[in-house]
A protein has these predicted regions:
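Extended, low-hydrophobicity, polar/charged segments
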Residues: 1-166
Length: 166
């Protein structure tokens, strides 16, 4: 069950402010229970898991890198690192918090202290509406692939190599 009630949280407020600044009316939905995974969010929304845009933070040569991936995919770090010409590692919780101002399970594509280099999984273009976390594990907001690219300044890319796709 979701609602758009009067709940607040500082990280969610920052996401809403970032959306408004980009000319997008925030439509944040709150869940009664946390939805920290793509499967949980998809079940709560009644959508395909591929329509969930996971916000995953990695480090690329020591700098934070946000990868927005379809909930149906796993990021192939070797493949992506090779495409980018460097090494990608999963960020720890402290790095995620410092880079985004949000905690793992609720990281949004926007509302961070500073803009992050962002890669967006091309597979998200397969869905007319996609859902991303809104700064808290109990929240999501709807967007589109094109809007997500615009909001994040993201680079569309595959996130799975040929051997890992399937």
């Amino acid at each position: 069950m979701t609602d758009t009630g009067d709940r607040t949280h500082p990280a969610v407020e920052r996401v809403e402010a970032a959306l408004r600044a980009a000319g997008v009316e925030p439509r944040v939905r709150w869940f009664e229970t946390a939805t920290p995974t793509a499967v949980a969010a998809a079940e709560a929304l009644g959508v395909e898991v591929g329509a969930i845009a996971n916000s995953l933070v990695f480090t690329f040569d020591g700098e934070p890198l946000l990868v927005m991936t379809s909930g149906a995919h796993r990021v192939d770090t070797a493949f992506l690192g090779e495409r980018l010409g460097g090494r990608i590692r999963r960020a720890d919780a402290d790095t995620v918090r410092a880079a985004t101002g949000q905690t793992i399970g609720g990281v949004a594509p926007v509302g961070h202290p500073e803009p992050l280099r962002t890669l967006v999984d091309e597979a998200l273009a397969d869905y007319p509406e996609i859902w991303a976390a809104a700064g808290h594990a109990h929240t999501v907001f709807p967007t589109t692939f094109d809007e997500l690219l615009r909001l994040t300044g993201g680079e569309p890319t595959p996130v799975e190599g040929p051997a890992s796709a399937g």
